[in-house]
Amino acid sequence: TAEVMSHVXAHFGKALEE
């Protein structure tokens, strides 16, 4: 679902910043 994608995106974005 779009909700899951949004959550995953946020998680990945944070991981990339770290």
Curated annotation (Swiss-Prot):
Residues passing through the membrane, by range: none
Source domain of life: Eukaryota
UniProt entry keywords in alphabetical sequence: Olfaction, Sensory transduction, Transport
Reported tissue expression: Antenna.
GO BP annotations, alphabetical order: sensory perception of smell
Family: Belongs to the PBP/GOBP family.
Biological function: Present in the aqueous fluid surrounding olfactory sensory dendrites and are thought to aid in the capture and transport of hydrophobic odorants into and through this fluid.
Assembly mode: Homodimer.
Record protein name field: General odorant-binding protein
Organism (species): Lymantria dispar (Gypsy moth)
